[in-house]
From Swiss-Prot:
Its main location: cytoplasm. Pathway: Cell wall biogenesis; peptidoglycan biosynthesis. The gene is ddl. Belongs to the D-alanine--D-alanine ligase family. It comes from the Bacteria. It is found in: Cytoplasm. ATP binds at residues 129-184. The keyword Manganese applies. SUPFAM superfamilies: Glutathione synthetase ATP-binding domain-like, PreATP-grasp domain. Mg(2+) 1 binds at D253, E266. One of its GO terms (cellular component) is cytoplasm. GO terms for biological process: cell wall organization; peptidoglycan biosynthetic process; regulation of cell shape. This is D-alanine--D-alanine ligase.
Length: 304
């Protein structure tokens, strides 16, 4: 096996997704240790990143979610320290974390994305409701794990929802409702893995359904996708990742309309690795166990 040296599993951090990161990090740490890797937990909230060098770490497995973890900040710090790390580089991480600018790139390249609008204090909210229709989704562009996502169903409600969300960093976007199903497709080293059909017991795949409930149904392989649709989803996932320069292990989320058309929703450049997480479920269908998946991701560690 490749010699990775002393490995820091970067987990925790400062974002609203701290607890999820700690869960993912603990699972990864145990998996790496089970494979004989000299791995240790490292929480930047508790210990400055500059200590990585002082403590002799040679590789970083980054599983820091959200702000400062997957937005290019920690990636830049690791570049300066010269420590190889897993996941995408600075630019791809920053773009992937920004749903608005990621959508602009996908649109420019002709990839299918749901119609959306950016909201501001002076937005004509009635016009946006008329344009996108109801229901619609409103979300912060720079949050993950469905933090701050609201389904707007009532006419005249858009402005008040915007007021509730505008304290979040970055743009607030409204998005047309696509009602044919939710899906996700991991990409590892430029190869699309089996897609997953997500059937939440809640109204949509929100934070509660992702992390706190056990009644969300995950179909992998998806029972309602044809072979052609599955192939297209994998192709679109790979193209979506390549469009922003994402590397290593990523996950692209999709919506399917009632007419069967697939839309790219967003990309996660540092997907979760908890017991509820989607990438391990997809890898398992390919015959790759959790510990082996962690090793494959660790092999992608890089600088530059």
């Amino acid at each position: 096996m490749q010699n990775f040296g002393k490995v820091a599993v970067l987990m925790g951090g400062f974002s609203s997704e701290r607890e999820i990161s700690l869960d993912s990090g603990t699972a990864i740490l145990n998996a790496l240790k089970s494979k004989g890797i000299d791995a240790y937990a490292f929480d930047p909230k508790e210990t400055p990143l500059s200590e990585l060098k002082a403590q002799g770490f040679q590789t970083a497995f980054n599983i820091l979610h959200g702000t400062y973890g997957e937005d290019g900040a920690v990636q830049g710090a690791l570049e300066l320290l010269g420590i190889p790390y897993t996941g995408s580089g600075v630019a791809a991480s920053a773009i992937g974390m920004d749903k608005y600018r990621c959508k602009l790139i996908w649109q420019a390249l002709g990839l299918p994305v749901p119609e959306f609008a950016v909201l501001h204090d002076d937005t004509d909210f009635d016009a946006v409701e008329e344009k996108l229709g109801l229901p619609m989704f409103v979300k912060p562009a720079a949050e993950g794990s469905s933090v701050g996502v609201v389904k707007v169903k009532g006419k005249g409600r858009l402005k008040s929802v915007y007021e509730e969300l505008k304290h979040f960093q970055g743009e607030i976007i409204a998005e047309r409702f696509i009602g044919g199903g939710e899906y996700s497709c991991p990409v590892l080293n430029g190869k699309g893995l089996p897609g997953i059909h997500i059937i939440p017991a809640t109204e949509f795949y929100d934070y509660e359904a992702k992390y706190n409930r056990n009644d969300t149904i995950y179909q992998c392989p998806s029972e309602d996708l044809t072979e052609a649709e599955e192939s297209l989803m994998r192709e679109l996932a790979v193209r979506g990742a390549q469009a922003i320069g994402a590397e290593g292990c990523v996950r692209v989320d999709f919506l399917k309309d009632t007419d069967g058309k697939l839309y790219l929703l967003e990309i996660n450049t540092l997907p979760g690795m908890t017991g509820h997480s989607l990438v391990p479920k997809s890898a398992a269908v390919m015959g790759v166990g959790f510990a082996d998946l962690c090793i494959e991701i660790l092999k992608t560690a890089h600088v530059g």
